[in-house]
Amino acid sequence: MIDQNLLRTNLDDVANALKLKRNFILDVNQVKALEEQRKTLQVTTETLQAERNARSKNIGAAKARGENISQLLAEVDTMGNQLEIAKTELDKVQSEIRELLLTIPNLPAEEVPLGKDDSQNKEILRWGTPRQFDFEIKDHVTLGENLKGIDFPTGVKLTASRFVVMKDKIARLHRALAQFMLDLHSEQHGYMEVNVPLLVNHDTLYGTGQLPKFGEDLFHTQPLTGQDPNEVQRPYGLIPTAEVPLTNLVRDEIVDEDSLPIKLVAHTPCFRAEAGSYGRDTRGLIRMHQFEKVELVQIVAPEKSMEALEELTGQAEKILQLLHLPYRKVLLCTGDMGFGSAKTYDLEVWLPAQNTYREISSCSNMWDFQARRMSARCKAKGDKKTRLVHTLNGSGLAVGRTLVAVLENYQNADGSITIPEVLRPYMAGQEAITG
């Protein structure tokens, strides 16, 4: 959520920036009308409160003098009723302002390139050289099915399309990737591993920006029958990423600045409805309703957040480097960034069967956008004032997509898969997966 004071002091500039950089049309007249109502009602409530307090004191003095206080009591009661009405109206207007603020995207950092879509993203670097194959390349689906380790038909039978069953050595390789990522981030990069709920309430989803704007992308819980009005309602959402519960750990908290940065990592299943992606990536593991991811989150002091973004992105890159997977690092343009991000790097891994780079990690600095929604603050020792923290998040990495990259980049002519050296300790020393 952007700072409401920006709308009060620089409304036209903010509106122009949102239109230019975010293709978001802010209704300036609506903002002005709500702000005028808020100021008027604020003055009214403060005036009524002051007058009511003054007359309440007069009642005590008049009573001490033995005067008739019935008229004063009636006036105080009337003012009390007027005050309650004014407070109710003020609360309503403030609620409308908050609902409006919750729909406004973050303002990009100055260095973010202007652009409409991913074609105008800026490539920062490439690492590694794509392997040259001397045999016909198979995609991960064919490789996995031939090894009897990837089973999409059973996933459809059990649930629906975009679900999968993994078996045997492929399932173990998938698990090995997640364990390798967790170990590297927790043992070498200084992150604390956290096990979080997969179901979260609406306050949590509002805190990180999934609600109210992206509810259709979430899976929500509800009674299976939906017929009995006496059934207990369970208004929870399945997490689309561990960023949601991890970041919300500091919601409504004031943390000691000496404890910053807070660096958290979690390995979780993630659930996404993939609304609007019909027909895209229908084959394989690239776009699933359920997938696993190792997520990195940092909570930092405001002046440290850009430095932290470089660090976090580099830590995600380290996974790809140790796996010897070619990738490129891309700075997203204004038109391709996420709703709450101020600056985002994407890491895209080379997939031989597609002959292209595909996103495997997105690392973002949210500035104080999420912190303001969550009321997540920090305070220095000896300082009475608090300030909003900055939050960052990134995939370190998406496990399923990393599996895709390993299968395709490490395939052999006979259909076997060479296991990357760093994963062999997690695979009982096995060097290859064979049929």
From Swiss-Prot:
<dbReference type="InterPro" id="IPR045864">
    <property type="entry name" value="aa-tRNA-synth_II/BPL/LPL"/>
</dbReference>
<feature type="binding site">
    <location>
        <begin position="359"/>
        <end position="362"/>
    </location>
    <ligand>
        <name>ATP</name>
    </ligand>
</feature>
<dbReference type="GO" id="GO:0005524">
    <property type="term" value="F:ATP binding"/>
</dbReference>
<dbReference type="GO" id="GO:0004828">
    <property type="term" value="F:serine-tRNA ligase activity"/>
</dbReference>
<feature type="binding site">
    <location>
        <position position="395"/>
    </location>
    <ligand>
        <name>L-serine</name>
    </ligand>
</feature>
<dbReference type="GO" id="GO:0006434">
    <property type="term" value="P:seryl-tRNA aminoacylation"/>
</dbReference>
<keyword id="KW-0648">Protein biosynthesis</keyword>
<keyword id="KW-0067">ATP-binding</keyword>
<dbReference type="GO" id="GO:0016260">
    <property type="term" value="P:selenocysteine biosynthetic process"/>
</dbReference>
<dbReference type="InterPro" id="IPR033729">
    <property type="entry name" value="SerRS_core"/>
</dbReference>
<dbReference type="InterPro" id="IPR042103">
    <property type="entry name" value="SerRS_1_N_sf"/>
</dbReference>
<comment type="pathway">
    <text>Aminoacyl-tRNA biosynthesis; selenocysteinyl-tRNA(Sec) biosynthesis; L-seryl-tRNA(Sec) from L-serine and tRNA(Sec): step 1/1.</text>
</comment>
<dbReference type="GO" id="GO:0005737">
    <property type="term" value="C:cytoplasm"/>
</dbReference>
<comment type="subunit">
    <text>Homodimer. The tRNA molecule binds across the dimer.</text>
</comment>
<dbReference type="InterPro" id="IPR010978">
    <property type="entry name" value="tRNA-bd_arm"/>
</dbReference>
<comment type="function">
    <text>Catalyzes the attachment of serine to tRNA(Ser). Is also able to aminoacylate tRNA(Sec) with serine, to form the misacylated tRNA L-seryl-tRNA(Sec), which will be further converted into selenocysteinyl-tRNA(Sec).</text>
</comment>
<comment type="similarity">
    <text>Belongs to the class-II aminoacyl-tRNA synthetase family. Type-1 seryl-tRNA synthetase subfamily.</text>
</comment>
<dbReference type="InterPro" id="IPR015866">
    <property type="entry name" value="Ser-tRNA-synth_1_N"/>
</dbReference>
<keyword id="KW-0963">Cytoplasm</keyword>
<keyword id="KW-0030">Aminoacyl-tRNA synthetase</keyword>
<keyword id="KW-0547">Nucleotide-binding</keyword>
<protein>
    <recommendedName>
        <fullName>Serine--tRNA ligase</fullName>
        <ecNumber>6.1.1.11</ecNumber>
    </recommendedName>
</protein>
<feature type="binding site">
    <location>
        <position position="295"/>
    </location>
    <ligand>
        <name>L-serine</name>
    </ligand>
</feature>
<dbReference type="InterPro" id="IPR002314">
    <property type="entry name" value="aa-tRNA-synt_IIb"/>
</dbReference>
<dbReference type="InterPro" id="IPR006195">
    <property type="entry name" value="aa-tRNA-synth_II"/>
</dbReference>
<keyword id="KW-0436">Ligase</keyword>
<dbReference type="InterPro" id="IPR002317">
    <property type="entry name" value="Ser-tRNA-ligase_type_1"/>
</dbReference>
<dbReference type="Pfam" id="PF00587">
    <property type="entry name" value="tRNA-synt_2b"/>
</dbReference>
<feature type="binding site">
    <location>
        <begin position="272"/>
        <end position="274"/>
    </location>
    <ligand>
        <name>ATP</name>
    </ligand>
</feature>
<feature type="binding site">
    <location>
        <begin position="241"/>
        <end position="243"/>
    </location>
    <ligand>
        <name>L-serine</name>
    </ligand>
</feature>
<dbReference type="Pfam" id="PF02403">
    <property type="entry name" value="Seryl_tRNA_N"/>
</dbReference>
